[in-house]
Amino acid sequence: MNITIILIIIGLLGISAYYTGLRKSLTLREDKLLHSTPIYHGAILAINSSLASILLVIVWVLFEKNIFPELLAFRNILFILSIFIFFLTAFFTFKKIKNEFKARDKVEKIIELFLLVCSSLAILITVGIFLSVIFESNRFFESIPLTEFLFGTHWSPQMPIREDQAGSTGAFGAVPLFAGTFLIAFIAMCIAGPIGLMSAIFLSEYASKSVRDIVKPLTEILAGIPTVVYGFFAVIVVAPFIRNTGNYFGIEVASESALAAGLVMGVMIIPFVSSISDDVINAVPQNLKNGSLGVGATKSETIKLVIIPAALPGIIGGLLLAVSRAIGETMIVVMAAGMSANLTANPFEAVTTVTVQIVVLLVGDQEFDSPKTLAAFALGLVLFIMTLILNYIALHIVRKYREQYE
C-alpha cells in the first residue's frame, strides 16, 4: 500500500480520535469540573495515537531497504502495524481521560517539544550544508593552494596557463570574482540604501494612512517579482540605455556592464531596505517624537535629530542584511553583467560574481573529482562565510548599540 494513503488514513483516524476524546470529556464535565477544557482531551488523544503511527511509518521507510529488503512488496504489513499501533495507543490514552487528567499540560509539552525539534532541525540542516561544503572544498584545496585561490588575480578554469598546475585545468584566482561581486553590490546599495530609507521615512512620518495603505503594498510587490524579470529589464532597457548614453558622451560602455546589473539589483532590493527601515522607525517610541515637537523642533528636525539616531542601529543592520542579499544574487548578474572574470573597478565594463561562476562550474555533466568542479564548493564556502559574517555583524550592531527605552 502506498505510504501517502497510509498517512491519509492515519490522519482521518486522528480526526475521529479527536472527536472521541472531546465527547468523553464533555460527558465527564457534566458530573465534575475538568482540569483541562474538552478540546485538550480530544487533542491529546489524537496527537498520541497519530504520532505513534506516523513515527512507525517514518522508521519503516528509513530502514526498510536495509533491514527488510524482502518485504518491499508487502506494504500491507506496514499498514496493519500502523493501524494496530494507532488503536493500541488510542486505547491507553482514552483510559487516562478523566476529570483530573492534565491534558492541557501534556499538549503544551508536546507542542514545546515539536517547536524544539523544528528549531534543531533548521540548525542541523545549516550545519550539514556547511560540513558538506567544507568536505568538498578540502578536496579542492588538496589540488589548488589556498593562497592561489584567495589572492590569485586570474580566473580561467577552462584555460591552462602553466604545465605544472593541477592537471593543467586553468587558473583559480578568485580575486576578480569577489571584486566583481563587491562592485555590483556597492552599486546596488548606492541605489537601494538612500531610496529605501527615504521611502521608509515618507511612509512612517509624512504619508497619511490612506496613502500608506496604498503605497506600502505597491512597494512590497516589487519584492515578489522573480529576479529573472529584473534580468530581462536590465538586458532590454537599462543596459542599452547606459550604452547609448555613454556613446553619446564618448564613453566606451560594454553591452554587459556592472553598472546595469547594479542599478537593477538596487531597484530589486529597495523594498527590502524600505520594509526593514520602516519597521525600525515605527519602533521608536512616540513619546520621543512628541517631546521633540513639544520643545519647538520641526518635523524634519525631529526626524534628523531624534528618530534617525534612535533607529540608526536597526537601519545599519538592515543595510548589512541587504548587502548579503545583493552578494547572493545570481540571475540579474548572469543576464546583465556577463560571465567574464574581469578585475576592474570600472562600472562600465563587464564583470562576473561568485554566484554566477558557481552556476557556470556546475552546469552540464561534470566530474566531481576535478578541480574545476570542486572550485564551485570552494567559492560557496567563502561566500557562505562572508554572508555569515555580515549577518553576525548586523545582529551584533542591532543588539549592542540599540538604545533601550522605558
What feature does the model see in each segment?
Residues 135-175, 230-266, 338:
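Membrane-interfacial helix termini and adjacent extracytoplasmic/periplasmic loops
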Residues 189-191, 202, 209, 252-294, ...:
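Membrane-cytosol interface at the C-terminal ends of specific transmembrane alpha-helices
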Residues 74-90, 172-202:
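Transmembrane alpha-helix signature in integral membrane proteins
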Residues 217, 221, 276, 281, ...:
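Transmembrane alpha-helices
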Residues 333-384:
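Interhelical loop and adjacent transmembrane-helix boundary motif
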Residues 98-104, 187-219, 394-400:
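Transmembrane-helix boundary motif in ABC transporter permease subunits
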Residues 279-282, 286, 293, 320, ...:
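C-terminal transmembrane helix and the adjacent membrane-cytosol boundary/short C-terminal tail
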